[in-house]
Amino acid sequence: MAPDTCCCSATALRRRLPVLAWVPDYSLQWLRLDFIAGLSVGLTVIPQALAYAEVAGLPPQYGLYSAFMGCFVYFFLGTSRDVTLGPTAIMSLLVSFYTFREPAYAVLLAFLSGCIQLAMGLLHLGFLLDFISCPVIKGFTSAASITIGFGQIKNLLGLQKIPRQFFLQVYHTFLHIGETRVGDAVLGLASMLLLLVLKCMREHMPPPHPEMPLAVKFSRGLVWTVTTARNALVVSSAALIAYAFEVTGSHPFVLTGKIAEGLPPVRIPPFSVTRDNKTISFSEMVQDMGAGLAVVPLMGLLESIAVAKSFASQNNYRIDANQELLAIGLTNVLGSLVSSYPVTGSFGRTAVNAQTGVCTPAGGLVTGALVLLSLNYLTSLFSYIPKSALAAVIITAVTPLFDVKIFRSLWRVQRLDLLPLCVTFLLSFWEIQYGILAGSLVSLLILLHSVARPKTQVSEGQIFVLQPASGLYFPAIDALREAITNRALEASPPRSAVLECTHISSVDYTVIVGLGELLEDFQKKGVALAFVGLQVPVLRTLLAADLKGFRYFTTLEEAEKFLQQEPGTEPNSIHEDAVPEQRSSLLKSPSGP
């Protein structure tokens, strides 16, 4: 085998298995930092996983089932050292909406979402995510933060029999507010206050420096440990308090209850399910999930790619977006074999990972191992965790998702983008897919309007000059013809015109036909239309079209000088052999400009 072939094969293998790129350089220093980061993330993900299972409407163990597979898959396939895959608030909300509190539906949704994500990665379809704009994403996540947060008020206050639909939830929560359990309310609010205080301490902790006294370094390390593991600390403390009351025969808190012990069995996803003595087939399950088969994989990819790009930019490295699609897709497919529901990249846990100095995705191995150990040995203790404490964890986790700044920023910068933001935000309270679909449609209409009606710069005078400020595509050709016709041909008398094409990088057949008809209109009026600033690919295309009366000039001055010739002078059409020498040489270059 030729050396070049071996080199290409090795490069391709490293691209598909990024672990091969950094493992040869792995060091003991990296191992120490990765271990600390993995442990920190593990202490964060365990209480969050239990809490997010509640958001998803599933038994608590399903949160833990969903929390470890991504750690191992991303070790091999991930291109970001910071990202951690697992259950998130947004994904849990979507799962709740599309799986009807049925674990079988949730696991099948993970499998099908993973297949779709894998296909997108293999076919390099990641660019499709670019059509969901930032205002749409912000509108959805802001609405989701309110939906998720308010949905936990019932657990925070110990209320029972509250519906899950948002508007009914709001109504019944206020209707039954008098049934608040004092124990749950006190514990929940105290847990939330403690979490907020610890988070504030973490954010305002002074950076370390070599000249710190040993006692100060130790104190800082202790505070850093407590604030980083604040979720685990608060949930563990609440569980101890609840256990103390339980052994005395008092029951002031609503507890999580019995959790299935042990590791999840490895089995294929359920392609049918029996409910109320009726077997629901695979096709019926797919039909029941409906739009979720598009919304869940797309939102999972968006959330994960957004997290990866954010931390890659912050920490000065690059990610491979299509490789990230493969990583998250395979995570969901393999996760479905161990009863996981759909997962994605977690911003909060990724931030913990980055702040603790993680060096490689190997930190995920520690996190995954910690989750497996907790499943195997600690599930009996998790049953004493009060639901109000988990509600406090969720509410403090989703509060930052509500982005007030985006509303102010768009008002100052681009008010039109407030339209898709508000449409998505408001409709997401009604139906999630309607919010995302309507917001994306509004964004697309705004984009199409700018394509169909590009802004132009106009210079009036004896010769009319028009310059499109952006590209020229087929939806815009009629508007362009109308603008030139109204200003030049319908003037009294008709006057010649120049089309300045500096910003036009390509033209399609419809544009060529429209320009040909425009040239004929100018000839009928006895005036001329000249083209200036054509890029080489566009010039090639127009010359190949052999448009009658086509004239091209290098500069605007040349065009104006030509068009201002004495009446009766017949100008010569410019063909490829008459193009200025510099341009002609470019035309002959197969590589373009």
Curated annotation (Swiss-Prot):
Keywords: Anion exchange, Cell membrane, Ion transport, Lysosome, Membrane, Transmembrane, Transmembrane helix, Transport
Coarse class of the protein's main subcellular location: membrane
Disruption phenotype: Conditional knockout from Purkinje cells (PCs) induces a negative shift in the reversal potential of chloride as reflected in the GABAA-receptor evoked currents, indicating a decrease in intracellular chloride concentration. Both in vitro and in vivo, PCs show a significantly increased action potential firing frequency of simple spikes. At the behavioral level, mice show deficits in locomotor activity.
Signal peptide from the UniProt entry: none
Catalytic reactions on record: hydrogencarbonate(in) + chloride(out) = hydrogencarbonate(out) + chloride(in); sulfate(in) + H(+)(in) = sulfate(out) + H(+)(out); oxalate(in) + chloride(out) = oxalate(out) + chloride(in)
Domain of life: Eukaryota
GO cellular component: apical plasma membrane; basolateral plasma membrane; endoplasmic reticulum; Golgi apparatus; lysosomal membrane; membrane; nucleoplasm; plasma membrane
Subcellular location: Cell membrane; Lysosome membrane; Apical cell membrane; Basolateral cell membrane
NAD is among the record's keywords: no
Function: Sodium-independent anion exchanger mediating bicarbonate, chloride, sulfate and oxalate transport. Exhibits sodium-independent sulfate anion transporter activity that may cooperate with SLC26A2 to mediate DIDS-sensitive sulfate uptake into high endothelial venules endothelial cells (HEVEC). In the kidney, mediates chloride-bicarbonate exchange, facilitating V-ATPase-mediated acid secretion. May function as a chloride channel, playing an important role in moderating chloride homeostasis and neuronal activity in the cerebellum.
Protein name listed in UniProt: Sodium-independent sulfate anion transporter
Native source organism of the sequence: Mus musculus
